[in-house]
Structure formats: structure tokens, C-alpha cells
UniProtKB/Swiss-Prot annotation:
<dbReference type="InterPro" id="IPR027434">
    <property type="entry name" value="Homing_endonucl"/>
</dbReference>
<keyword id="KW-0238">DNA-binding</keyword>
<protein>
    <recommendedName>
        <fullName>Probable cell division protein WhiA</fullName>
    </recommendedName>
</protein>
<dbReference type="GO" id="GO:0043937">
    <property type="term" value="P:regulation of sporulation"/>
</dbReference>
<dbReference type="Pfam" id="PF14527">
    <property type="entry name" value="LAGLIDADG_WhiA"/>
</dbReference>
<keyword id="KW-0131">Cell cycle</keyword>
<dbReference type="InterPro" id="IPR039518">
    <property type="entry name" value="WhiA_LAGLIDADG_dom"/>
</dbReference>
<dbReference type="Pfam" id="PF10298">
    <property type="entry name" value="WhiA_N"/>
</dbReference>
<comment type="function">
    <text>Involved in cell division and chromosome segregation.</text>
</comment>
<dbReference type="InterPro" id="IPR023054">
    <property type="entry name" value="Sporulation_regulator_WhiA_C"/>
</dbReference>
<dbReference type="Pfam" id="PF02650">
    <property type="entry name" value="HTH_WhiA"/>
</dbReference>
<feature type="DNA-binding region" description="H-T-H motif">
    <location>
        <begin position="275"/>
        <end position="309"/>
    </location>
</feature>
<dbReference type="GO" id="GO:0051301">
    <property type="term" value="P:cell division"/>
</dbReference>
<comment type="similarity">
    <text>Belongs to the WhiA family.</text>
</comment>
<dbReference type="InterPro" id="IPR018478">
    <property type="entry name" value="Sporu_reg_WhiA_N_dom"/>
</dbReference>
<dbReference type="InterPro" id="IPR003802">
    <property type="entry name" value="Sporulation_regulator_WhiA"/>
</dbReference>
<keyword id="KW-0132">Cell division</keyword>
Amino acid sequence: MSFASETKKELTNLEMKECCEKSELSALLRMNGSLSFSNRRLSIDIQTENAAIARRIYTLLKKGYDVTVELLVRKKMRLKKNNVYIVRLVEKSREILADLHIVRDDFSFIRNISQELIEKKCCKRSYLRGAFLAGGSVNNPETSSYHLEIFSLYKEHNDSICELMNGFDLNSKTLERRKGYITYLKEAEKITEFLNIIGAHNALLRFEDIRIVRDMRNSVNRLVNCETANLNKTIGAALRQIENIRYIDETVGLDILPDKLREIAQLRRDYQDVTLKELGEMVSGGKISKSGINHRLRKIDEIAEKLRAGETVAKK
């Protein structure tokens, strides 16, 4: 089961206040429902591939309106051939849609979220929970980039969801897709806040555990890469220094170098694996700092480059 499916399964087991049940159900019917007329009767089909969500819708309708509800199961014939669960409402369809503020009394469609559904903070959380159950998805934090989104067919409703989320300081953004609109989150911290808002506390804990391990692994990798880069840089510098010292020795001899440079050149040539700090501790006349050793080695590099350019180098 995917991380998103586990999250939704957890949400379908939450208990709610009566006012919150109405808010969640409104989001579920608005986003997953479709209307049809048969034998001069209006019916509502709420379709989902998630059995737990279908049971949730069925229970909320029975509890809230005491109506006859049908639960149908069909199998997709394409792609994954998953089961499709259809919750069918044939009684009081018009009255329920009006009560859930999906249509007006004249049966015109309400495209945004009615304020009556989200007057209380608990109801705002419940509407977002219903919206996530109906059209939401969240990436597995273990295998991909952090991303949570809620899909809506209508721009006005999508903008309302974004506004509702940002009322909780989530910094959500909207984007137009080919067949609708999405409100999305990209920051890991905001995704965990959203999971907390809608009541997915187990999913939140798992997300955070994975995120901590993942961030720690990334930090270690960055540190290792940095250490490797520094090591490669150090090795490259040492090889260059040794090559330059050999070139000077074979061309004009190390005796051409000033005494201080000649001593460092001989030490670098004879002890190729030691660090600059260790070289500084090996010189006669007292310890020299790494920067001091580096300075002398740069002077040796300059002399080697002059010799390669055909210039004459006299001993100073």
C-alpha cells in the first residue's frame, strides 16, 4: 500500500463532530460525485477506487440523512483493473446537495466553498480532510521529492481550497492542469503541518521519521562529497608539487633553490604522503605553519613554471 493510501485509510477511521461530518461529506460529494437522471429520478454516484473511502461516504450519508444508499463494486477493464466503488444515493438527492451547500435552491451549482460549512476551525480541518480524501495525493517521502496536492475540476473551488489551507499558514500554491486545477505543497514542514491539520497523525510521524533519516543521509553524503573533493584537491596539489620539484631537480638541480625552499623541496620529495602540517614539523630551526609551508611550495611552483617557459633562474 502506498504512503498516500495508508494516509487516507487512517483518515477514514477518525471520529468527528456532527458539524464536521457535514463539512467532510460536502467535499467528498462535490469532488467525487456525479449526477444522473433515471426514470425521472435524480441520483448521485460518488465514485472512488478506495474501499475505505467508499465505506466512509456510505456511513456519513446513512448517519446524517437516514436515506437508502447503494454500494456497488465494478472492476476497471483497463490498466491496473482495480475495483471501482460507487456509492449511489437515490433518495433526497436534491435536498442533500442543497444542505451540503453544493447547489442552491434553484439547483444552480455553487463553485466555491460555502462559509456556512467552515465557520468553525474544526470544520475547516474536516473540509480539507474530505478534499484530500476525494482528490488528494502525497508522494512517498522515502523515494521522491516532497509533494502534496489536491485536485479540483473548478478554478473557483480550487482557489477556495488554497485560501482555506493558507488560513493555516501553509503557503500553498495553485496550478492549472490539463483537466483541472491543483493546490499543492512542496515544503516538507508544510506537508507535515497539513497532515496534522487533517488528523493524519500516524502518517505525520512516519513522514517525519523518513524525512529525518533522509535529511541525515543527505547531510552525510554532502559531507563525504566535500571531504572527497578536499582530499582530491590535496592529492592533486601534492602531485603537482612533487612533479615540479622533480622537474627542477632534473633540469637545474635543487641546489639552485634558496636554502629554505630547497629544504622544503627535499622533504616534499622524500616524504610524499605526509601532510603540510607534518612537513612543517620536520623542518630544521623550528616548526612552520601550514600557510608558511604552502607559501614556500608556491614559490617552488613558480620557479618550475619559469624554467618551463625557458627563463633563467638564479640562486638567491
